[in-house]
Design a protein with these regions (language model features):
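ATP-dependent adenylation/nucleotidyltransferase module used to activate substrates
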Residues: 4-143
């Protein structure tokens, strides 16, 4: 799958293009097609680190990727290396900007957890630090 990403003041756009084998969900019921989505928020600015923009894309489409994921914007080497250590079903194969400094944790940053409400994410939340923010990514299911 290839993801085209554009960040503007107040808006981020994602254009997802499937490769052969992409689009199926492990549940066998849900499918993904080529789609464009956007997020509007006044806090969004064009200075969002590329690694953050790409991890958002990864979280949106993770279950639907068959072999590889690439992005239209370069990412840090640390992002690709770290993500590929965690991924087992597919790998990230994209342009690496060796001059791009990996995103640092802000001084008052808090850990986040992609939270589904299921057993695994509930267990993960139990062992995370108390200041962890559980983030639920709403994926409306078709009937």
């Amino acid at each position: 799958m290839h993801v085209k990403i554009k960040a503007f003041e107040g808006r981020v756009e994602y254009d997802f293009k499937l490769d052969n084998g992409d689009g199926g969900h492990p549940d066998g019921k849900t499918k993904m097609e080529n789609i464009s989505v956007y997020f509007k928020n006044p806090l969004i600015n064009e200075d969002i680190h590329n690694d953050i923009l790409c991890v958002v894309a990864l979280l949106i489409v993770n279950p639907f990727i068959a072999n590889k994921l690439s992005f239209s914007i370069p990412v840090s080497n640390k992002f690709v290396t770290s993500a590929n250590k965690m991924l087992s079903k597919y790998k990230i194969e994209t342009e690496i900007d060796h001059d791009l400094t990996p995103r640092e944790i802000p001084n008052h940053g808090r850990p986040g957890l992609a939270f589904s409400g299921g057993c695994d994410s509930s267990a993960a939340l139990c062992i995370m630090p108390p200041e962890t923010v559980p983030v639920f990514l709403e994926r409306p299911m078709s009937e």
